[in-house]
């Protein structure tokens, strides 16, 4: 009989294939080298554009009537929501653009070396939910391709019972999308920018072509924009506006939280800012309008409102299964599938995979972590998000904001107000360093997050089942949670840091140990350029040398010396860590004792 230890041994990543030395340090955590910072305007535009040119954004306006707003008013709430998203996203991009680090190190900066596990766990959970939602829509896009290939598949009989909120075709498409998407995880995360650009461009032209065809065939855009009226009045209407703004931000909040993961690839702040702003204003406004036009024209053409573009193509093909209609369905289905696939791997699969690889390097690499996310996402039964009730969809999307907005608020406050955009990256790779706080946790950040998130939970429970209670104050707070929770967490964290200050001993690194900046950029930051650091000094600090072939050679050298990741996750000998602390030059003008750094005092 195979023992548990034997099973775990077989599941281990081979040592020569491990992408991690320890939970503290792995290639995906290190600041991006200057030569790999290749994401210009189009890459940054595509990262956010792919979120906009997606099926989820197309059908987003369908929720308008459920909250009592007209379609034009709903588009107005989305524009305001875009403005809010831009502010949050750009403010959260600084760790990536300033220090070329991603989400995980940003969590260490704010929540502490051990407290960062909390932020990682939250993002993994959010990634699983987001993965499930987008994979379901991606499966419907796969069916557009299959419908164009086979008349028999177009009319495939449903063999599932009515109690199941999906059909046989939907199951097939869902599984195929998972298989195709999983194949992408044999790529590396830094290679996806060109896929994002291609997918974004193809989907943009497909959506435009689809709308041009529908309006031409229907003789106009239809009457939905003018025929639907707002049913909410007075304060109810105001709160409906607030709710839709919160819903809109909540639906893209995972992307805002992930911003540092991709802003670190940026060639310049200008490329990051212009790409992000334009992508969040133009397509995120146009695509919901396309969805309304599609539903409006389908009333005249097919006798009912069809919000999902896949349903429109189904009627399209059933009405006329000609070569032209099949070609249109195929190319649109292909572009929509690419869009959903790109969105899924960039915002969910790779994000979760990197987090899990950093936590369990002995058993999980990025590929395994991403595949694990894909498998677990099926258990969420995402077909219920879309096929049962619009309230389910709204609740799922808005729940992202309830959990993530307080995290964003704390991160922005710590970065812009408390530390004023100054972080020591090398200290994030040491246990008892600058970010050890109290026992490895920054309790101020946790208090601020809990106090910002908790008030929105009763409202979310009410949204799921309004028979629990009917307290208007709680419901209204839930509607405006994206605003209220941000303000609560931001200012509470600020106050806690003023009343219980932590001591900043190392303002930022004195040398560019990672080659993340040009010589000129490093000097402007008060750092010795990477080109002027000796190989011996880099070796002493256990950082990749610019005179070697990089991290792989460093990893091999360390393993030969017998310093490998142990079962408790530690990869450094104690004398190396102490030596690093001793050699680190302190650049802050503030003073505090060594004990204050390791065990903060109140």
Language-model segments: which ranges?
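Juxtamembrane transmembrane-helix boundary signature
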Residues: 78-111, 120-126, 130-136, 498-501, ...
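Membrane-embedded translocation segments of transport machinery
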Residues: 61-84, 88-93, 206-381, 390
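Intrinsically disordered, low-complexity terminal tails of fungal membrane proteins
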Residues: 1-32, 502-602
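C-terminal membrane-solvent junction of multi-pass transporters and transport-like membrane proteins
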Residues: 407-491
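Membrane-water interface regions at transmembrane-helix termini and the short interhelical loops
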Residues: 66-68, 93-95, 110, 118, ...
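Membrane-interface "cap" regions at the ends of multi-pass membrane proteins
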Residues: 2-71, 86, 207-210, 214-220, ...
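Membrane-interface loop-to-helix entry segments
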Residues: 133-139, 172-217, 224-226, 276-280, ...
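Loop-to-transmembrane helix boundary motifs in multi-pass membrane proteins
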Residues: 163-175, 358-387, 434-455
């Amino acid at each position: 009989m195979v023992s548990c230890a034997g099973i775990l041994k077989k599941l281990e990543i081979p040592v020569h294939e491990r992408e991690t030395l320890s939970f503290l340090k792995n290639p995906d955590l290190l600041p991006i080298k200057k030569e790999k910072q290749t994401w210009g305007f189009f890459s940054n535009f595509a990262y956010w554009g792919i979120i906009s040119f997606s099926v989820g954004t197309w059908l987003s306006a369908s929720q308008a009537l459920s909250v009592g707003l007209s379609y034009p008013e709903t588009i107005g709430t989305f524009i305001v929501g875009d403005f809010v998203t831009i502010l949050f996203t750009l403010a959260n991009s600084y760790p990536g653009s300033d220090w070329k680090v991603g989400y995980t190190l940003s969590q260490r900066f704010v929540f502490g070396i051990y407290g960062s596990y909390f932020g990682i766990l939250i993002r993994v959970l959010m990634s699983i939910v987001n993965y499930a939602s987008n994979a379901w829509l991606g499966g419907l896009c796969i069916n557009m391709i299959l419908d164009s290939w086979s008349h028999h598949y177009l009319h495939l009989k449903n063999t599932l019972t009515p109690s199941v909120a999906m059909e046989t075709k939907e199951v097939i498409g869902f599984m195929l999308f998972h298989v195709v998407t999983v194949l992408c995880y044999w790529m590396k995360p830094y290679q996806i920018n060109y896929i994002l650009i291609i997918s974004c461009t193809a989907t943009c032209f497909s959506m435009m072509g689809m709308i041009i065809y529908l309006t031409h065939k229907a003789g106009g855009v239809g009457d939905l924009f003018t025929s639907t009226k707002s049913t909410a009045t007075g304060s109810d209407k105001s709160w409906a506006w607030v709710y839709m703004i919160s819903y809109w931000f909540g639906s893209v909040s995972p992307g805002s939280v992930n911003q540092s993961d991709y802003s670190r690839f940026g060639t310049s702040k200008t490329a990051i800012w212009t790409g992000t702003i334009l992508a969040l204003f133009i397509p995120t406004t146009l695509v919901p309008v396309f969805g309304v036009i599609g539903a409006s024209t389908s009333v005249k053409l097919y006798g009912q409102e069809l919000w999902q573009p896949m349903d429109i193509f189904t009627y399209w093909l059933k009405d006329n299964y000609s070569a032209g209609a099949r070609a249109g369905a195929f190319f649109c289905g292909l572009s929509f599938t690419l869009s959903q696939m790109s969105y899924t791997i960039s915002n969910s699969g790779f994000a979760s995979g990197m987090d899990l690889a950093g936590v369990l390097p002995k058993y999980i690499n990025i590929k395994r972590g991403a595949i694990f996310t894909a498998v677990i996402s099926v258990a969420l039964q995402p077909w219920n998000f879309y096929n049962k009730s619009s309230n389910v969809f709204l609740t799922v999307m808005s729940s992202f904001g309830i959990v993530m907005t307080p995290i964003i608020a704390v991160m922005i406050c710590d970065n812009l107000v408390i530390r004023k955009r100054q972080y020591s990256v090398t200290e994030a790779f040491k246990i008892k360093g600058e970010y050890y706080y109290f026992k490895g946790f920054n309790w101020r950040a946790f208090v601020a997050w809990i106090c910002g998130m908790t008030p929105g939970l009763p409202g979310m429970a009410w949204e799921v089942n309004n028979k629990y209670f009917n307290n208007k104050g709680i419901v209204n707070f839930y509607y405006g949670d994206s605003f209220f929770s941000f303000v609560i967490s931001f200012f509470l964290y600020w106050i806690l840091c003023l009343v219980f200050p932590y001591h900043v001993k190392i303002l930022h690194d004195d040398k560019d140990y990672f080659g993340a900046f040009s010589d000129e950029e490093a000097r402007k930051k008060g750092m010795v350029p990477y080109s002027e650091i000796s190989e011996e000094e880099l070796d002493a600090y256990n950082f990749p040398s610019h005179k070697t072939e990089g991290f792989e050679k460093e990893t091999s050298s360390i393993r030969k010396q017998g310093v490998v990741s142990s079962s408790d996750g530690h990869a450094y000998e104690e004398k190396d860590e102490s030596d690093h602390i001793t050699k680190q030059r302190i650049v802050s003008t503030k003073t505090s004792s060594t004990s204050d750094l390791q065990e903060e005092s109140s």
